[in-house]
Amino acid sequence: MNSVAPTTPIPNPLQSQSGFAVPPGALEAEIDELITHYPQKRSASLMVLHAIQEHFGWISQEAVEWSAHKLGLQPINIYELVTFYPMFRASPVGKYQIKVCRTLSCALGGSHALHKHFCEKLGLDAHAHGLQTTKDGKFTVEFVECLAGCGTAPVMMCNDDFTKA
């Protein structure tokens, strides 16, 4: 018995109540082109996530589901990447992202005081876990794992700019 695929297209989860919508062809065309550089679609997963985050500023659950569908994977496969790699954001962040290293070298070099200083200046809770964003949406502060500058601790990043003491 021959089965016929449904003719109803799968809805694009980026077009949802969260306000996400792929620009007509622009982002999807970029992603389609990225995928062609890899022997298997799944191998493009990180690059697809980078493209989505660069466009939207973060990776929503809808984007996870859309990416999984696009790459022929299960959403959990994409979610694992989003939650494993510290460069990906699963929630909205401020225009300015301040990341302070909290690993041993930086902690001994004063990263906790640096983090506390930023939080106090921006009206955030210095003792809260995870990332925090100011009410105006301008700044996000978070403790992160090693930023690979142990010899010049403490280190931090503001957006993509690496800063050391």
Locate the predicted segments by residue:
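Signature of N-terminal electron-transfer/Fe-S-associated modules in redox systems
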Residues: M1-A165
